Regions:
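Short, charged helix-capping/linker segments at alpha-helix termini
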Residues: 2-7, 21-30, 40-59, 70
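Acidic, Ser/Thr- and Pro/Gly-rich low-complexity regulatory segments
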Residues: 10-16
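Charged catalytic carboxylate motif
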Residues: 12, 38, 81
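Hydrophobic/aromatic residues within well-ordered alpha-helical segments
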Residues: 31-35, 39, 86
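Structural recognition of an alpha-helix C-terminal capping motif at a helix-to-coil junction
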Residues: 41, 55-62, 76-88
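Short acidic-aromatic loop segments in the C-terminal HATPase_c
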Residues: 65
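Arg/Lys-rich amphipathic alpha helix in sigma70-family domain 2
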Residues: 69-70, 84-104
Length: 104
């Protein structure tokens, strides 16, 4: 694994981003392989039910796929960007659950 500098993704991150930005599904597989544990770590305390976590993680994957073009290295690391997406989406999911609304 490459050591990452502050605000500068390592080679693996660049490769993952490049694949995602070209629409290569293998990029998402690589991203989830490398950062899936981080995403689960962020989501778990917010969504204690496994079913809710799995639903949310699917939504997170879709959001990453749709918005990968908005990631810029000068604003932070890939891990920080993914953490922000996961946290915000988990909070939104929890709010919907609390209100009794389910996303269809």
């Amino acid at each position: 694994m490459t050591t990452r500098g502050r605000g500068e993704p390592g080679l693996e991150d660049r490769e993952i981003l490049q694949r995602l930005q070209t629409g290569d599904a293998a990029g998402m597989e690589a991203l989830l392989g490398q950062y899936g544990a981080l995403l689960r770590y962020v989501v778990k305390p917010i969504l204690p039910r496994e079913e809710d976590r799995e639903d949310c993680l699917s939504e997170i994957s879709l959001r990453i796929w749709e918005r990968v073009g908005s990631f810029t290295e000068d604003r932070g690391t890939l891990a920080a960007w993914l953490t922000a997406i996961a946290r915000n989406m988990a909070l939104n999911h929890a709010r919907r659950r609390a209100c009794g609304h389910r996303r269809s």
